[in-house]
């Protein structure tokens, strides 16, 4: 097979190539299937020396493939260095990939491996936890430089699909993307976030009997939360701050920003504030905004 790239045409770069990587058991294959359903050409664990050539072929204006995703995991020999070299080479060719890192907590990964009765690829003669921690150490540098980190610890397959779809909403138009997610501190703080906000300083609708059964997406709760002067001042200030931060994020090549808004249970205050914050951010030009309520259905 001839993998030589034509040199007489400019590469097609409207949609950047995507590299999906992360921890074994964190949902790499599931993410790949979602992208396939979205019309991406997805290939898994091809030798690193072929990745650049394949992406170049797809970048050719005459190629029928306009969206390509490469899934690469720790089973690739000398994984970390190889993948970093591939990313660097593609960037030098003007084909800088979007790197998506799939992550999950150790206890969740152990449960998933146990349920499937599988051993970890780096486990050797040790325990599952030993294999997972070895992989974390190898993958840490890739995670730190990833454009998007998706923590699948608390996501169902449907939640994961929604997260992938939301993160890729604006990619074709090269828009900066902001995901505003609400959560409850009692369920743990999200690890896949850039900016974390605590709105427990606001009056809690939970203690208003007639509001307790509702959620922050319901008008009675939303009206109650947003009627507070502190809520309005916070929203004004934070929206202004994020507008001011955007050029810096853009300069650093960070086009995917996650803002996490937390209250106690993730049902009322954080949901109402996240919805209103997203509404305001949608008024900002060239910004793609999505909302995710992580804990709204939890007890």
From Swiss-Prot:
Write the signal peptide boundaries. Answer: none
Q: Which family does it belong to?
A: Belongs to the RapZ-like family.
Identify the NCBIfam families for this entry: PRK05416.1 (NF003828)
What name has this protein been given in UniProt? Nucleotide-binding protein DIP1313
Recorded GO terms, molecular function?
Answer: ATP binding; GTP binding
Q: Which Pfam families match?
A: PapZ_C, RapZ-like_N
Question: Per its UniProt entry, which superkingdom is the organism in?
Answer: Bacteria
| HAMAP family in alphabetical order | RapZ_like
Which InterPro entries does its entry note?
A: P-loop_NTPase, RapZ-like, RapZ-like_N, RapZ_C
Q: Which residues bind ATP?
A: 22-29
Keywords attached to this Swiss-Prot or TrEMBL record, sorted alphabetically, are: ATP-binding, GTP-binding, Nucleotide-binding
Per its database record, what is this protein's job?
Answer: Displays ATPase and GTPase activities.
Where is GTP bound in this sequence?
Answer: 73-76
